[in-house]
Amino acid sequence: MAQTLAQTKQISQSHTFDVSQSHHKTPDDTNSHSVIYSTQNLDLWYGENHALQNINLDIYENQITAIIGPSGCGKSTYIKTLNRMVELVPSVKTAGKILYRDQDIFDQKYSKEQLRTNVGMVFQQPNPFPKSIYDNITYGPKIHGIKNKKVLDEIVEKSLRGAAIWDELKDRLHTNAYSLSGGQQQRVCIARCLAIEPEVILMDEPTSALDPISTLRVEELVQELKEKYTIIMVTHNMQQAARVSDKTAFFLNGYVNEYDDTDKIFSNPSNKKTEDYISGRFG
């Protein structure tokens, strides 16, 4: 399977991009992790609404980056630029660059479909397809041309194990995913994402609709997943950001107000507005 999917993940290297003039907001200690995403001077508008302003942000491989900030600050808009889902909004326009492994994802030669193979997404509300658990997991691999049932069976088991839900569901694979609890549905959605072997997983408030026990399970899963994947998570939950993330970016009014190691953001922020937000003075 890995070889088959890898063949679908080859991106043209026919042109390079000059990044020498850019400036990034980056934590002081990168812990030797490589930059996988580099956002450079990004602005975004919904019609006349200037939703993101001069965003400069480096995301590091195999780390969990939390995106925090009050409602309407641009958090969800930002992560939807990372896989270009934001382009589904007709009035949207952008300026600046987002480099994914040194390639500008806004370049017309860059494949949007390829990007979404490399960068999976888990949404706020669990959104399984109205199909069996098995068909949910195999949906992506089948689109990529995998038809062999033995291979598909292996993908299902591997993905559900990766989402820490195989033991719960291994005898129910042909049950409709809608019959599961909210927490189980969300982990099936994570497994569906893992089935296409992404490098990055975007999570937009992945536990906000879940009960505390399901939330804890998803948080534990996210911590395990960073061994193989880069995780970028939007959350309103300050305690969650502090518990699970390595880096935290605080967005405010469309800007990155502060970006640093999570421990520093929550113990000794550099910016007064960051301190006010995480201490609950506004938000």
From Swiss-Prot:
Catalysed conversion reaction: phosphate(out) + ATP + H2O = ADP + 2 phosphate(in) + H(+)
Gene Ontology molecular function terms on file: ATP binding; ATP hydrolysis activity; ATPase-coupled phosphate ion transmembrane transporter activity
Quote the CDD domains the UniProt record gives. ABC_PstB_phosphate_transporter
Matching SUPFAM superfamilies:
P-loop containing nucleoside triphosphate hydrolases (SSF52540)
Listed PROSITE patterns: ABC_TRANSPORTER_1 (PS00211), ABC_TRANSPORTER_2 (PS50893), PSTB (PS51238)
Q: What is its main location?
A: membrane
Q: Is Nuclease among this UniProt entry's keywords?
A: no
* Annotated Gene3D superfamilies: P-loop containing nucleotide triphosphate hydrolases
For the region Disordered, give the residue spans: 1-32
Q: How does it sit in the membrane?
A: Peripheral membrane protein
Top-rank taxon, per record:
Bacteria
Q: Where in the cell is it found?
A: Cell membrane
Its family? Answer: Belongs to the ABC transporter superfamily. Phosphate importer (TC 3.A.1.7) family.
Q: How does it assemble?
A: The complex is composed of two ATP-binding proteins (PstB), two transmembrane proteins (PstC and PstA) and a solute-binding protein (PstS).
What role does it play? Part of the ABC transporter complex PstSACB involved in phosphate import. Responsible for energy coupling to the transport system.
Task: Return the protein name.
Answer: Phosphate import ATP-binding protein PstB
In its UniProt entry, the species of origin is given as Staphylococcus aureus (strain NCTC 8325 / PS 47)
